């Protein structure tokens, strides 16, 4: 059964046990004021998780301010975060409040922090110690909860270690869509109803959606469904009607071709035990059974070979 929630104007839908567990962690962590590091691929829902953390927290009535660090030159990071005063600059700029001040008593979400240069990242880390207005000797401390997100495991670990040296910090990992296939149908049907409530998926179309690896995650699924619905000519979307991203399928197909072999290996390693094999692959038993049927894998023959 899919769950649907709204967090600060952003809709979130999930049906998989992994996302249920993740949002249970979100509700628990939201009650504290601890900084949070989010690790998740592009399009996996990092902003949704950040907004949910703010929504469930006591800071909910206060501002939620977000900044995409990857779109900002390193030399502007400090001015954006701390603000500036014209007395500290040679150019005739007026005084401007920084994002830390704007987010006072609320939440500051720093997305794509892994794309920052080391020097800029070091400046950001200073915000966890003290915040000040650029050009002022006097320091003014801000009461802000900071959530930092990245798609790079190494960046997440580096940031987590750096923050842990200063204070307790939480780390949340957002699973990619390919590791929670139970969410594909719920999300796809939702996106389709948004675009055209009269359209439905044929069984073959849903099979095609399940077989795709979704390197762009939920964002790519949404764009694929909307694009396919716009060009649909009938009441049903069939497998041939699904318009996958033209930039990705070749690479994706190469990875997808490895999946049957990975499943066979997991079954062999687990002695044919589906639950153990599913756990090793990071998916549910239901998802594994569906993939076995899709690829036409003969598990009986495989188990007999293992036992021989």
Language model region names:
Residues 36-37, 48, 52, 74-79, ...:
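Conserved AAA+/SF3 P-loop NTPase catalytic/coupling segment centered on the Walker-B
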């Amino acid at each position: 059964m899919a769950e649907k929630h709204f967090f600060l104007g952003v809709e979130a839908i999930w049906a998989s046990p992994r996302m249920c567990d993740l949002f249970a962690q979100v509700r628990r962590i939201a009650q504290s004021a601890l900084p949070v590091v989010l690790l998740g691929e592009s399009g996996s829902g990092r902003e949704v998780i950040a907004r949910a953390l703010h929504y469930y927290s006591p800071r909910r009535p206060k501002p939620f301010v977000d900044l995409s660090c990857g779109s900002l030159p390193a030399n502007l990071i400090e001015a954006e975060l701390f603000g500036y005063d014209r007395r500290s600059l040679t150019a005739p700029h007026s005084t401007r409040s920084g994002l830390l001040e704007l987010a006072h008593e609320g939440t500051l979400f720093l997305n794509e922090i892994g794309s920052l240069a080391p020097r800029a990242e070091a400046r950001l880390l200073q915000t966890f110690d003290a915040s000040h207005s650029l050009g002022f000797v006097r320091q003014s401390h801000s009461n802000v909860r900071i959530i930092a997100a990245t798609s790079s495991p190494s960046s997440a670990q580096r940031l987590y270690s750096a923050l842990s040296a200063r204070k307790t910090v939480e780390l949340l990992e957002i699973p990619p869509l390919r590791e929670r296939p139970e969410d594909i149908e719920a999300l796809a049907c939702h996106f389709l109803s948004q675009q055209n409530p009269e359209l439905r998926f044929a069984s073959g179309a849903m099979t095609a959606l399940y077989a795709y690896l979704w390197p762009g995650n939920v964002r790519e699924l949404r764009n694929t469904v909307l694009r396919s619905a716009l060009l649909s000519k009938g009441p049903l979307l069939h497998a041939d009607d699904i318009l996958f991203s033209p930039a990705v399928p070749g690479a994706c197909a190469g990875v997808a071709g490895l999946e049957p072999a990975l499943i066979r290996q997991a079954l062999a390693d687990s002695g044919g035990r589906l639950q153990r094999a599913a756990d090793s692959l990071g998916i549910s038993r239901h998802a594994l059974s569906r993939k076995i049927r899709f690829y036409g894998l003969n598990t009986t023959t495989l188990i007999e070979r293992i036992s021989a």
